[in-house]
């Protein structure tokens, strides 16, 4: 029969494989924006990347996400914590706390509040885009592709807000006014918009101070 030490090694190896798989699956499913801020070189970590995407924000996705979290928790619970190494036990506890926190929202998906005056998506997304670093030409191409998806993504947010309103969970008039006010700064002429200015600055930094004409060529090569 396998020794106790051998059994622990087997459990620890299985846990490492589980953690690695969950890490890759989560990041492979992440939006291009999220992935860019987490990992510099996804391929070197074994993370598969598809076409650039802002992701989706739909009620069905929230429900599916909770179902997936429940499935991952069930897999996590199969491990004997006492057989794990100390660092694995720390990761186990962290994962369990994260999953438990996520599952507190199960059945309450329509209470999700993606829009709010100061920390809503409409306030955070432009800032994240403005701080999106250009480390290679693909980053620039992905960034431009993300900009093309903004209308579609905001359309999904609007549809979700209509679903909330139909369920009696819509924003108050004051909340809507505050959110609208928070968007006014993004409605200035494009040539004066901070996203345009930051794009030009990042492009110049990436190209080593080349002229605007040379930068235009960089994008069309």
Segments from the language model and where they lie:
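N-terminal maturation segment of proteins
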Residues: 3-221
